[in-house]
Amino acid sequence: MALIVQKFGGTSVGSIERIEQVAEKVKKHREAGDDLVVVLSAMSGETNRLIDLAKQITDQPVPRELDVIVSTGEQVTIALLTMALIKRGVPAVSYTGNQVRILTDSSHNKARILQIDDQKIRADLKEGRVVVVAGFQGVDEHGSITTLGRGGSDTTGVALAAALKADECQIYTDVDGVYTTDPRVVPQARRLEKITFEEMLEMASLGSKVLQIRSVEFAGKYNVPLRVLHSFKEGPGTLITIDEEESMEQPIISGIAFNRDEAKLTIRGVPDTPGVAFKILGPISASNIEVDMIVQNVAHDNTTDFTFTVHRNEYEKAQSVLENTAREIGAREVIGDTKIAKVSIVGVGMRSHAGVASCMFEALAKESINIQMISTSEIKVSVVLEEKYLELAVRALHTAFDLDAPARQGE
């Protein structure tokens, strides 16, 4: 008998019909002998609706009171699912984050989990009940309701699995696993049977929407086996684990991630003096703008060009800050480009194989795709290119690294 934590997102519980379907799935697992803790999000769109209500009162809701409002969304779904389970003869009980003492810090709207008191949950499991817990929320040391921010329900599920030492944390979504890339771009993309935490963390940070990065970090830290599954289709999904595959068939590259939300800024004619990088990026950091990739050209005539990328939503703000910096340090000009994209190859196989970056560059060159920037890590190579070439680049790389070949045995 296994202890499983199951997490269902907003689309999975987006209607009464879907909640009934989730109840059937949970019932089948319980009948198979598993002990179950089920974590739920609010119904799809409900959190936004609640935030909109708050903003009808004030443009800047008090963070503490906003947490009180938005936390009610999960209370609705946990009660409805618990009712649906009891109707089916499955003993069940629902709890809010406060009731099971998911203790967080006091950073309202973006709180971090500090500790979980698992005694109440363990007592219910011992009595044969399915425990249904509200995701996305907790309580601070003062008794105030807190919410965990983006990806919070995934994080709740993983944190509960870690506290309970669960055999597996299952994340149910609208996809049936982690794919080598987005099947909408490459129809030949394959579902991965397994992927490491390290690879998944890179893919999540690079724009993969399957799992939120905080939950992957948490799972990796506490070695919680994660499995991504489809809410309403049967299948093995994808297991995310700390163990690296030791099969001879293991590909060098596990997946290709891409991001359309990048923008590039270049400050030209910068006096080539010590500390110039700080003079440029210091004000950017002080403006709370996150920088991704950075390139500084070789100095020429005692001046240099400095290029970096930011999220497209931060482009105008970053451009304004950079133009002020350019005037202060005597740079020639600032130019920007919002029509770029980032494409990355990810795989632990890079550690033991040389020439991976060269293969990537060759595949792009064959399609006459110019590379504007390059960034590497131990298991990742990222490039920036013109946005119009994004899908062509992804397809070319998918083929070059044999990712659209027939699935390996076991998939």
Swiss-Prot record:
<keyword id="KW-0021">Allosteric enzyme</keyword>
<keyword id="KW-0547">Nucleotide-binding</keyword>
<dbReference type="GO" id="GO:0009090">
    <property type="term" value="P:homoserine biosynthetic process"/>
</dbReference>
<protein>
    <recommendedName>
        <fullName>Aspartate kinase</fullName>
        <ecNumber>2.7.2.4</ecNumber>
    </recommendedName>
</protein>
<dbReference type="GO" id="GO:0005524">
    <property type="term" value="F:ATP binding"/>
</dbReference>
<dbReference type="Pfam" id="PF01842">
    <property type="entry name" value="ACT"/>
</dbReference>
<keyword id="KW-0808">Transferase</keyword>
<keyword id="KW-0486">Methionine biosynthesis</keyword>
<keyword id="KW-0791">Threonine biosynthesis</keyword>
<feature type="domain" description="ACT">
    <location>
        <begin position="265"/>
        <end position="348"/>
    </location>
</feature>
<dbReference type="InterPro" id="IPR041740">
    <property type="entry name" value="AKii-LysC-BS"/>
</dbReference>
<dbReference type="InterPro" id="IPR001048">
    <property type="entry name" value="Asp/Glu/Uridylate_kinase"/>
</dbReference>
<dbReference type="GO" id="GO:0009089">
    <property type="term" value="P:lysine biosynthetic process via diaminopimelate"/>
</dbReference>
<comment type="pathway">
    <text>Amino-acid biosynthesis; L-lysine biosynthesis via DAP pathway; (S)-tetrahydrodipicolinate from L-aspartate: step 1/4.</text>
</comment>
<keyword id="KW-0067">ATP-binding</keyword>
<dbReference type="GO" id="GO:0009088">
    <property type="term" value="P:threonine biosynthetic process"/>
</dbReference>
<dbReference type="InterPro" id="IPR018042">
    <property type="entry name" value="Aspartate_kinase_CS"/>
</dbReference>
<dbReference type="InterPro" id="IPR005260">
    <property type="entry name" value="Asp_kin_monofn"/>
</dbReference>
<dbReference type="InterPro" id="IPR054352">
    <property type="entry name" value="ACT_Aspartokinase"/>
</dbReference>
<comment type="similarity">
    <text>Belongs to the aspartokinase family.</text>
</comment>
<dbReference type="GO" id="GO:0009086">
    <property type="term" value="P:methionine biosynthetic process"/>
</dbReference>
<dbReference type="InterPro" id="IPR001341">
    <property type="entry name" value="Asp_kinase"/>
</dbReference>
<dbReference type="GO" id="GO:0005829">
    <property type="term" value="C:cytosol"/>
</dbReference>
<comment type="function">
    <text>Involved in the biosynthesis of L-aspartate-beta-semialdehyde which is a central intermediate in the biosynthesis of different amino acids (L-lysine, L-methionine, L-threonine). Catalyzes the phosphorylation of the beta-carboxyl group of L-aspartate to yield 4-phospho-L-aspartate.</text>
</comment>
<dbReference type="Pfam" id="PF22468">
    <property type="entry name" value="ACT_9"/>
</dbReference>
<keyword id="KW-0457">Lysine biosynthesis</keyword>
<keyword id="KW-0963">Cytoplasm</keyword>
<comment type="pathway">
    <text>Amino-acid biosynthesis; L-methionine biosynthesis via de novo pathway; L-homoserine from L-aspartate: step 1/3.</text>
</comment>
<dbReference type="InterPro" id="IPR036393">
    <property type="entry name" value="AceGlu_kinase-like_sf"/>
</dbReference>
<dbReference type="InterPro" id="IPR045865">
    <property type="entry name" value="ACT-like_dom_sf"/>
</dbReference>
<dbReference type="Pfam" id="PF00696">
    <property type="entry name" value="AA_kinase"/>
</dbReference>
<keyword id="KW-0028">Amino-acid biosynthesis</keyword>
<keyword id="KW-0418">Kinase</keyword>
<dbReference type="InterPro" id="IPR002912">
    <property type="entry name" value="ACT_dom"/>
</dbReference>
<dbReference type="GO" id="GO:0004072">
    <property type="term" value="F:aspartate kinase activity"/>
</dbReference>
